[in-house]
Swiss-Prot record:
Modification Phosphoserine occurs at: S418
GO CC annotation, single: cytoplasm
Name of the protein: 2-(3-amino-3-carboxypropyl)histidine synthase subunit 1
UniProt binding sites for [4Fe-4S] cluster: C110, C214, C342
Compartment(s): Nucleus; Cytoplasm
Cofactor section: [4Fe-4S] cluster
Family recorded in the similarity comment: Belongs to the DPH1/DPH2 family. DPH1 subfamily.
Gene3D superfamilies: Diphthamide synthesis DPH1/DPH2 domain 1, Diphthamide synthesis DPH1/DPH2 domain 2, Diphthamide synthesis DPH1/DPH2 domain 3
Reactions performed catalytically: L-histidyl-[translation elongation factor 2] + S-adenosyl-L-methionine = 2-[(3S)-amino-3-carboxypropyl]-L-histidyl-[translation elongation factor 2] + S-methyl-5'-thioadenosine + H(+)
Knockout mutant characteristics: Global developmental delay. Abnormal palatogenesis; palatine bone absent, micrognathia, cleft palate and small skull. Results in death during gestation or soon after birth with a small body size. May also result in preaxial polydactyly of the right hindlimb and abnormal hepatic development. Knockout mice leads to an increased frequency of tumor formation.
Keyword annotations: Cytoplasm, Iron, Iron-sulfur, Metal-binding, Nucleus, Phosphoprotein, S-adenosyl-L-methionine, Transferase, Tumor suppressor
Length: 438
């Protein structure tokens, strides 16, 4: 599933900006022309890519052609970079655009790098592997962003068998995953609901079932276990931190193993509380704004600055694309750091830094804006976050709703189970964004 961000909308052939035709939103939905979709040469070229990875090549080519784009940039996580050269060759062969690969590290949707793309003269950016989390500031004409989720098909039957062998019928299970597996998650939920109380929780603006490393929903007390579909533990740990009393399981779609997973909540919380306690006696503060794509939020930075000014605490601002202990050690006069980039950097690696490295939430606790929360909040991009130390708090955009606790209702995906809700309910999908990006 892909989502398109455009700077203007008009009928095909209309002239908006210097020579770019625009298309209405109604024409954007799955109307790839037959000459593109059924092109035998294109079909043969796409066969080089893995058949279970949906890179949406025909749609991408059509979007580029419709935009009359001349310079296209591709941005993707490192796990997909091995396919980048092949995609470049295909796009350049079937469009008139020059295509380049943006090779800087891309950890998540927060790293979408439209700033660099525009600086390079790019008029069309394709971001692979993540949902459209960050609304684009499309006030600059003739720049578009296409999000390609890269839906990955897996052996759903094995997943279902694994769940049935592990959990007794009638169990209450919550299913979560990353965006690549949301369509499989929805299909599995439909199959399992006959024997289990299945919920696919949603933390808006994310899709039903989708979680991020920094954003996960609180589950209802009735949920007996949460099952995460995906490789690695980074995203799983997010929902575990938000729900410390619910047993967690991970199904690895590549290794085909369903395993019980554990997290040392006591150690994590003790470490973070120690850092907060140390920060309360700090006389000099450092505020780090992440510059890796759109990771940093100027709005949060401004809030922190205001709080420190009100308390008469001196601070220094530091812009960094990536944050390392060796870099911060070059400023020894700073007593405590607050990083507005990725909360998990502090949670996972904060103890590796010589000075306390707080998240904006932890800074709010240290400055007594809020008390320590149980469980630890994972609401950094949530539309129902706790306070102005999160990205979407108080933002003037269409109502997002709440981080929904799990219920016994399976969220229905549209268009055959694709993760369409990520785009249908997102302000940045196929329309002009109404607010600046964080």
């Amino acid at each position: 599933m892909a989502a398109l961000v455009v700077s203007e909308t008009a009928e095909p052939g209309s002239r908006v900006g210097p020579g770019r035709g625009r298309i209405s939103r109604g024409r954007l939905a799955n109307q790839i022309p037959p000459e593109v979709l059924n092109n035998p040469q294109l079909q043969a070229a796409v066969q080089v890519l893995p058949s279970n990875y949906n890179f949406e090549i025909p749609k991408t080519i059509w979007r580029i052609q419709q935009a009359q784009a001349k310079k296209v940039a591709l941005q993707m996580p490192e796990g997909l970079l091995l396919f980048a050269c092949t995609i470049v060759d295909i796009l350049e062969r079937f469009t008139e655009a020059e295509v380049m690969v943006m090779g800087d590290v891309t950890y998540g949707a927060c790293c979408v790098d439209d700033f660099t793309a525009r600086a390079l003269g790019v008029d069309f950016l394709v971001h692979y592997g993540h949902s459209c989390l960050v609304p684009m500031d499309t006030s600059v004409q003739d720049f578009r962003v296409l999000y390609v989720f890269v839906d990955i098909r897996i052996d759903t039957a094995h997943l279902l068998d694994s769940v049935r062998l592990t959990f007794t019928p009638g169990s209450s299970l919550a299913l979560v995953s990353t965006i690549q597996f949301v369509s499989t998650l929805q299909a599995a939920a439909q199959e399992l609901k006959a024997d289990y109380h299945i919920s696919v929780p949603q933390c808006k603006p994310l899709s039903p079932g989708e979680i991020l490393g920094c954003t996960s929903p609180r589950l209802s007390k009735e949920v007996e276990a949460v099952v995460y579909l995906g490789d690695g533990r980074f995203h799983l740990e997010s929902v575990m931190i938000a729900n410390p009393n619910i047993p967690a399981y991970r199904y690895d779609p590549y290794g085909k193993v369903l395993s019980r997973e554990y997290y040392d909540h006591q150690r994590m919380q003790a470490t973070r509380q120690e850092a907060i306690a140390a920060a309360r006696s700090a006389k000099s503060w450092g505020l780090i704004l992440g510059t890796l794509g759109r990771q940093g939020s100027p709005k949060i930075l401004e809030h922190l600055e205001s709080q420190l000014r009100n308390l008469g605490l001196p601070f220094v601002r530091l812009l960094l694309s990536e944050i390392f202990p060796s870099k911060l050690s070059l400023l020894p006069e700073v007593d405590v750091w607050v990083q507005v980039a990725c909360p998990r950097l502090s949670i996972d690696w904060g103890s590796a830094f010589p000075k306390p490295l707080l998240t904006p939430y932890e800074a709010a606790v240290a400055l007594k804006d809020i008390s320590w929360q149980q469980p630890y909040p994972m609401d950094f991009y949530s539309g129902s976050s706790l306070g102005p130390w999160t990205v979407n708090y108080g933002r003037d955009r269409a109502p997002r709703g709440l981080c929904q606790p799990a219920s016994d209702k399976v969220q229905q995906g549209s268009r055959g189970g694709s993760p369409a809700p990520a785009c249908e309910s997102c302000n940045c999908a196929d329309q002009k964004a109404t607010s600046p990006a964080p």
